[in-house]
């Protein structure tokens, strides 16, 4: 017996719904893996080109740390009265790994969601990249507007660009999202695809009217009179018994 045949026996039901349920599981697992792996890659990258640094100063922003030319950039920022980069998002960086693990588990638990609860397992994956962008903008705005009035170089308050090319005083800046951010986006895409497929499965389920937040028929497809009775659908169970009798 081949692997596919073994899977088919483990997951009974109409062929199209069986295949959909397999894809739902694969997409949910892949989504969780992508979201969790994004922790190990930068979410945002920033480059500043100055006369004394023609090759540019580069900083990579991870969820829990900063890498790159952080010290050199802090020295330049000191002249315009900006705080050190390490002072930004300290709380967010402390809880980043815990939050990402929870988010990955939510995507993984989508496997067990019922018709009524499926959307609640999708929304966190959508909200996470948006929250990251909002939090990043907040700190860029805060650092660019809370400049030390006694700084050697006086410049007007500003907000560094999140994406694209910008200018700060005589310096040019370039900002892009990193691989970690795109992995998180891809994680949402896969859990959304799982959600769409799950809707098709749930809509075809004979006991969908009795479905709750968690699916009680995850590994089986309702088809026996006893299963409809347990779902509270006694009339359906009676019809099936009459058809078999």
Language-model segments: which ranges?
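Extracellular-facing segments of soluble proteins and assemblies that are Gly/Ser/Thr-biased and enriched
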Residues: 75-140
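Hydrophobic alpha-helical membrane-insertion segments
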Residues: 31-44, 122-146
